[in-house]
Amino acid sequence: MALEAGYDYLHVAVVQCTPTQAAAVLGVLLLLAIRLAAAARSSSATSPKWKQHRLPPTPPGKLPIIGHLHLIGSHPHVSFRDLHAKYGHNGLMLVQVGAVPTIVVSTPQAAEAVLRTHDHVLASRPRNPVADIIRYNSTDVAFAPYGVYWRTARKVVNTHLLSAKMVFSKRREREEEVRLVVARIRDAAEASPGTALDMTELLGGYASDFVCRAVLGESHRKQGRNKLFRELTETSAALLGGFNVEDYFPKLADVDLFLRIICAKAKSVSKRWDSLFNELLSEYALSGGKQGDHNSEDFVHLLLSLQKDYGLTTDNIKGILVNMFEAAIETSFLVLEYSMSELMNNRHVLAKLQKEVRTATPDGRMVMEEDLSRMPYLKATIKESMRIHPPAPFLLPHFSTHDCEINGYTIPAGTRVIVNAWALARDPTCWDKAEEFFPERFLEQGRDAEVDMYGKDIRFVPFGAGRRICAGATFAIATVEIMLANLIYHFDWEMPAEMERTGAKVDMSDQFGMTLRRTQKLYLVPRIPKCVSSS
C-alpha cells in the first residue's frame, strides 16, 4: 500500500544513518505528528472552506491524518476505479489523500469537462517538490504551472523540437538505430539458436539510444552517455512516481530537516543531471555553437540557438531537456515491451501482424518508414497495446486556479484533480471486450475505427488532451512503429523453451508509478525465418 511505502521510507531514513542523524530524525518525526494533525485539519475536505460547496461524493472510512490512504492499494488506478464504482457519481469522486483533497475523474464525460470544457481553469499543476529539484524548479513543459513561462516553453517544444517536420527529419536516425538492434538480434540468433534474449534490455536500449541521438547528436554514445542518460531517466521516473510524503502532507515542506531527508535522493540525481548538462554546454561553447545543416540539428543545439529569442535561462533549457529524456524514453520503451508481450500471449494476432508486415515490405531489406502506411494492423496493434496498458495510468495531476462546476459538483480553487486514464480505456460502457487485447476494434470495419489517441476521443487519452496534452506523442509513436514492424518482419518469435513446452503466458503483472512498468523482464527467442533475406 502507498501508506506502507511511506512508512518503509521513513524506516530506511532512520536505520541508514549515524546515531546523531537518527536522533535528529526521531525529533523530526515527533514534530511530524504535530504537523500532520494540523495539516489534516487545515486542508481537509471537511474544513469550513470546503463545506460551503457541493462536493463530489467521498468514500466512507476516512481516518484522521491519513484520510483515505488506507483504502488505496499497491495499484491506485485500480483502487480508484473500484472505489468510484461504489461511491463515485457522474464520473467524480473526492478522496482525502493524506492532507490533500483530491478529485478523481473516472468517466469520459467527466474527463471531457476537465480536459476541455474547463481546461482554462484546470490547466495548471500542483507543486511537486521532487519535480522542483529534478526539473530545475519545474521549468520543463510537463510540470511547469500554467502561465507565461509554460506557454513560452510549450511554443519552443511544439514549434522547434517536436513539430511534424522535425519528427519526419529524424527518420534516418530512427532507421539506423533500428538497423543496429536488428543486427544485434540476428547475430545472437545465428551464434546461439534457441537462446532467449533480454528484450527488456534491448528495447530499453533502443529507445534510449535513439532519444539520446535526437537530443545530443552524434556524440550520444561518447563515454557511455546513452547508458548514463538511461540510468538517470529511470531513477528520475521512479522518484517522481514514488510515494513522496510531502506530496500528501504539504505542510512538511516547512520542516527543513525533514524535507532534506526526503529530498536527498532527488538532489543527488539532480547533481548528476547537472554535471552532464554542464559538460554538454561546455562542449557546445568550445565548438563555437556551429552545427551544420539546420534540419539535422540535435535538440541541445536547437535550444541554445533559440535561447535569446525566447528569453530562456540555462536552467530552463536543462529542465526542458530532462523532460525530453524522461518522457520520450519511458513511453517508447513501455509501448514496445507491452506490445511484444501481448503479441506473445495472443499468437493469432502475431501471425496476422506478421503476414501484413511481410506482405507490405519488399524482400531483402528493412521495413522503412514509407512502408508503414500500408500496415493498418500494425497501427491498430500499437493503439490496442496503449489502450489496455497506457504508459501512464494517471495523467499528470491538474490543479484548479478558480472554482468551477462539473456535473453538478463544485471543484474549489486550489484542488488537485487526477484523470484515471487507465479506467477510461477499460470502461465497459465505452468499449466492447474492454479487458481483452483485440486490435481489430481499431480497423476500418471495427466499431472504434475512428478513435483517435491524440486527444480527440476522450475515451482514449494515453497522451492526455487539451492544453496539457503531451507534445511528444507523434515522436513516441514514430519511434515505436518502425521498431515493432522490423522485429515482426525479420524474426519469428517464441517463448523460452520451458514456457513453450508448458504453454505458459507472459506474466503481465505491473508496478505502479508515474508509469506502469512490468514487474518481470521479457525474455524471447528469435528465429530467423527462411522467407526473410538478410538486410
Curated annotation (Swiss-Prot):
Biological or metabolic pathway of the protein: Secondary metabolite biosynthesis; 2,4-dihydroxy-1,4-benzoxazin-3-one biosynthesis; 2,4-dihydroxy-1,4-benzoxazin-3-one from indoleglycerol phosphate: step 4/5
Keyword Iron: yes
Family annotation (Pfam families): p450 (PF00067)
Cofactor: heme
TM stretches of this protein: 14-34, 469-489
GO CC aspect terms: membrane
Topology class, membrane: Multi-pass membrane protein
Molecular function via GO: 3-hydroxyindolin-2-one monooxygenase activity; heme binding; iron ion binding; oxidoreductase activity, acting on paired donors, with incorporation or reduction of molecular oxygen, NAD(P)H as one donor, and incorporation of one atom of oxygen
Keyword Lyase: no
Signal peptide: none
Tree of life domain: Eukaryota
Listed EC numbers: 1.14.14.109
Catalytic activity: 3-hydroxyindolin-2-one + reduced [NADPH--hemoprotein reductase] + O2 = 2-hydroxy-2H-1,4-benzoxazin-3(4H)-one + oxidized [NADPH--hemoprotein reductase] + H2O + H(+)
EC category: oxidoreductase
Sections of the chain in a coiled coil: none
InterPro entries per record: Cyt_P450, Cyt_P450_CS, Cyt_P450_E_grp-I, Cyt_P450_sf
Compartment(s) where it occurs, according to its Swiss-Prot or TrEMBL record: Membrane
Residues given in the record as heme binding sites: 470
Keywords: Heme, Iron, Membrane, Metal-binding, Monooxygenase, NAD, Oxidoreductase, Transmembrane, Transmembrane helix
Family to which the UniProt record says this protein belongs: Belongs to the cytochrome P450 family.
PANTHER family: CYTOCHROME P450 FAMILY 71 PROTEIN (PTHR47955), OS01G0543600 PROTEIN (PTHR47955:SF14)
Physiological role: Catalyzes the conversion of 3-hydroxyindolin-2-one to 2-hydroxy-1,4-benzoxazin-3-one (HBOA).
UniProt name for this protein: 3-hydroxyindolin-2-one monooxygenase
Organismal lineage: Eukaryota, Viridiplantae, Streptophyta, Embryophyta, Tracheophyta
